[in-house]
Amino acid sequence: MNGVGLDFHEHNQVNYINPASYSSVDSLTFLFDAGISGQISNFNENGVKKNAKNANLDYVVAAFRAFRHMGVSFGILPFSNVGYNYSVSGWVNEETKEDYYTNTYEGDEGFHQAYVGLGYMPVKGLSVGANISYLWGKYNRTVTNSYSNSYINSLSRNYSARVGSYKLDFGVQYTQRVSKKDWVTLGLTYSPKHNLGASADMYQVKTNAMDGSLDTTSFSIDKAFELPHMVGAGLMWNHAAQWKVGLDYTLQMWEDFEKLVNDRSEEHTS
């Protein structure tokens, strides 16, 4: 699919991006698909460049025909992933060059989803479908600021969260023949806004390098994670079942969300 999937449907491929596509699964086939991916990241701060490489199991999915015009799919997909560890150093004051700082950034873990979905074709050319997913995982992020001058306190902040909740996705596809060898498919998807019910925790430690004393602060924000309304639309042209041209557009409505740290953290500081 090469990233285009809202309007894509084939009898021998699993398209979990739009659950309406499951209705096209071949009645004599059990489909199984798995994929891996690699990622190379480049970080640049104050002229210092770092590279990071990682590989992930992208997905494991399957699909089969349950009844006439009805297909079923299930699988495990990544929702997000975090993985980095790098540091940068520089002078606190570029003119005097007496003291320097080191900032260290670390992050790991990620979120995953296990889903099951149905796709049904009530009339020729029109398919509808839905996925229900269980979303789970955790993440950790740490930012540490340290200094060569013992009079300057070092600071470490750790951010963590654990999520376990559901996610819903709905899809529609409509295919219309426009000539003897050409078809056009319109695909639509919608995912409703949903609060994942998980809390976000922050733990801060300020260390005095002279006497080793610690000053700690922590706070937790309840129901800190929400998924926005997500709407997608796509159009695909299929010529003679030999080649396809498609275009997808997805909108995530993040403007409805409050600023998490600025607006809510002060209410939970302890």
Tell what function each PLM region has:
Residues 1-78:
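N-terminal, post-signal peptide beta-strand-biased segments of exported outer-membrane/organellar beta-barrel
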Residues 47, 65-270:
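Outer-membrane beta-barrel porins/channels
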